[in-house]
């Protein structure tokens, strides 16, 4: 089949999908399915932008959402780009909040075949966590959004990260970095508040690598800048080679939960509980059902020749439509909001993880205040 015929078939398929959705709405059809519709797709710049799904200079936002809807129906990847890029989907019905996890998000995370430090016990590989939000309301533009508080929410997540990317003025340029075709390709400017209350800011560039030659700027977006604001997760990549040739992207812990593309698709940790919803102050919110699901790339990290860390999604599953699921639902233990400062001695040897007040992991904590298991800990 030629490219022209393939494109015509795609157009027919898109028309059929939209026609079916319209007829179902007009006739009041109430059948619930696992079909999701992409209502927003706004990736940040990234090396697979405009290819997952494909887009050209003539592509509109509506058309790229239709293409993404088709991709998800086939469990094909949607690329969200670097930090802040997002996708919003809805099922043909509200997702109910029942006992245990309520939905699953498919990604492309996997464990490393060879971890030089942790070997077969590794929790590292290629994991690119995305923060998940749920929306309640009839219109995606006016609905109320709530973040699902994952395992890092009360400890190491930054909650007011803001970044602006500038549209590149050229697609090639000066380059000295390995595998780069343009070192100063995408300019960015970021601001945030550190855990100790210090206001921070930074400016830099993302390079364009030699493996992906198309523009990394989403072609359907208007304007010269893209700005994203929200939560930011701690970086998770380690250059295990020490030379930039072997990067391992780790899960935050074996029982880390609450993030898309941050575990294997078959794991319980790729499922999400609406009960994790919190408001902007981090307070628990009671929701009976949700209308929209948004996934946002949660890490701002660049890994040499691997490029930017980007969340990818490949599907969404309403677990309550899976036969027999509600009889034995997945229940994930969650970390509670810190309520005070506990006291421990510094000479204890255990597997507890400690973080300083900026969210950085501390391997050998000395005297001071740290965050551990969702609580502030004072080591004497």
Predicted features along the sequence, with ranges:
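Bacterial Sec-dependent N-terminal signal peptides
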Residues: 1-33
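Tryptophan-centered short beta-strand motifs
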Residues: 141-148
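Beta-strand signatures of extracellular beta-sandwich domains
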Residues: 131-133, 353
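Short loop/turn segments immediately following beta-strands, especially the blade-tip
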Residues: 136-140
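A domain-level signal for the mature, folded cores of soluble proteins
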Residues: 32-128, 150-337
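C-terminal tail/sorting-segment detector
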Residues: 14-15, 369-380
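Residue-level detector of functionally pivotal "anchor" positions at catalytic/ligand-binding pockets or at interdomain
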Residues: 332-358
